[in-house]
UniProtKB/Swiss-Prot annotation:
CDD domains, alphabetized: AAK_UMPK-PyrH-Ec
GO molecular function: ATP binding; UMP kinase activity
Gene3D superfamilies for this protein: Acetylglutamate kinase-like
Name assigned to this protein: Uridylate kinase
Reactions the enzyme catalyzes: UMP + ATP = UDP + ADP
Any GO BP: 'de novo' CTP biosynthetic process
Binding site for UMP: G55, D75, I136, G137, N138, P139, Y140, F141, S142, T143
Record-linked HAMAP family: PyrH_B (MF_01220_B)
Pathway listed: Pyrimidine metabolism; CTP biosynthesis via de novo pathway; UDP from UMP (UMPK route): step 1/1
Keywords for this protein: Allosteric enzyme, ATP-binding, Cytoplasm, Kinase, Nucleotide-binding, Pyrimidine biosynthesis, Transferase
Purpose of the protein: Catalyzes the reversible phosphorylation of UMP to UDP.
Residues reported in the UniProt entry to bind ATP: K13, L14, S15, G16, G56, R60, N164, Y170, D173
Regulation of activity: Allosterically activated by GTP. Inhibited by UTP.
Length: 240
């Protein structure tokens, strides 16, 4: 009997650090293969999946800005880093015979398709994995904001936030504070009021205004993406 997912269409947000694993920099081949296998498994269900990848494993725009670079230039470099990650993930997925398309907000026709909302939706309807790269194409906006915006544009049911080495949202950093409390459920307004570092405030406000749920969980545990898609209670669920 075919397994039925809880959601019809999801957006998976991966941080760049998640692709680096314990290496801290670059792309760990074992990690990206594991993530690709999990995404490919979800693609076989009755669920459409789009992926947004960060670029922090290669470059952070804010870091460059803090070191004296022009913020716009530093952010554009970060957008290019996300394209590198997207192409690496696409390659891993295609090795698993999973039909994949990379759509970039900055036009680079030789390596990817330009982002067009209707085209992205059509790819999803054809059960292709869609990877969004290059942020929203403008500096000063994070890939968290990209995830929120793209989720609204393609009418996704939820944003799945795969975190590196943390299994949900806590009241404080569990690595620093042993008394930190893990939340099973939060509202967007709670997240903003308590200053919980799930995503930046621009992305959080956008999700709240557009009623986009978030499910925050550990990406390092095998099978968690599928568990989240199937509706298992993992990590922290954030709703309006």
């Amino acid at each position: 009997m075919a397994q039925t997912s809880k959601y019809e269409r999801v957006v998976l947000k991966l941080s760049g650090e998640a692709l680096a694993g314990d290496d801290g920099f670059g792309i760990n081949p074992i990690i990206i293969k594991s993530i690709a296998e999990q995404v490919a498994e979800v693609a076989k269900l009755d669920c459409e999946i789009a992926v947004i990848v960060g670029g922090g494993n290669i470059w952070r725009g804010k870091t460059g800005s803090d070191l004296g670079m022009d913020r716009g230039t530093a952010d554009y470099m970060g957008m290019l880093a996300t394209v590198m990650n997207a192409l690496a993930l696409q390659d891993s997925l295609e090795q698993l015979e999973c039909d994949t398309r990379v759509l970039t907000s900055i036009e680079m026709k030789q390596v990817a398709e330009p982002y067009i909302r209707r085209r992205a939706i059509r790819h999803l309807e054809k059960n292709r994995v869609v990877i969004f790269a290059a942020g929203i194409g403008n500096p000063y906006f994070s890939t968290d904001t990209t995830a929120a915006l793209r989720a609204a544009e393609v009418e996704a049911d939820v944003i799945l936030m795969g975190k590196n080495n943390v299994d949900g949202v806590y009241s404080a950093d569990p690595k620093v504070d042993p008394n930190a409390i893990k939340y099973e459920h939060l509202t967007h307004i709670q997240m903003l009021q308590e200053g919980l570092q799930v995503m930046d405030s621009t992305a959080s406000s956008f999700c709240m205004d557009n009623n986009i749920p978030l499910n925050v969980f550990s990406i390092t545990e095998e099978g968690n993406i599928k568990r989240a898609v199937m509706g298992e209670k993992i990590g922290t669920l954030i709703t309006k």
